[in-house]
Amino acid sequence: LTSGYHQAPIHKNCQKYTAFLTPFGLYEWVRLPMGLAGAPSYFQRVMCTEVLAGLHAIICFLYLDDLIVTGRTEEEFLHNLSRIFQRLREKGLTLNPEKCVLGACEVEYVGHTLNSTGLHFERSKLDSILDWEKPSTQKQLKRFLGVVNWFRDHVKNHSTIVKPLNALLRNYSKTLKIQWSQEANEAFEKIKRAVHECPRLYFLDDVSPIFMETDASQYGIGASLYQRIDEKTVQAIAFMSK
């Protein structure tokens, strides 16, 4: 979308809460600005429940102003694309042609590489994790965990692996030095390897049999969903842990 937020109107009764002072007087936003705490969730709700109602999660998927349209065949894709264009036209929304990619078999979407078989991460992103130096402060560790948590849906038993690292964030202080234990050191190296080796996640093909593996300990629980393509090939569908 072109300046997506600015295409979302703010209710007249709420405009006063967006007021800001300038040398020329007090102004209020009539369209959604960047920076409001509730802007992302409001924009997502408007797009999913009003603009793309009946289409979202059926023929298209949306993350804020990034929209992806799908189709099993070229004809189906063009039909779905026409429906999306018609809906956006009806709602008065515009697209940025320079940022649009049409008819691609593989696209970069919300940090993932996505195609007809599934999704994965660029190898360069995974390789960079192995080079991450061990954090010396809680602030540095928190940043590291924020990065590896982005990959959690691709890592089996993620929560159990990082538990010793999360424990180091107790009594949080940005400058507090970390006292690394052997368990924490092992967890740090293990999560780096797990992220680096994280598998591609495949879409269900509606034909191959599926099976689930579960695991539990005193620290957490986990589940893994797979589909068996043949006697030698098993594909990962999803991982969950908490």
Specify the residue positions occupied by each region the protein language model found.
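Retroelement reverse transcriptase polymerase core
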Residues: 1-242
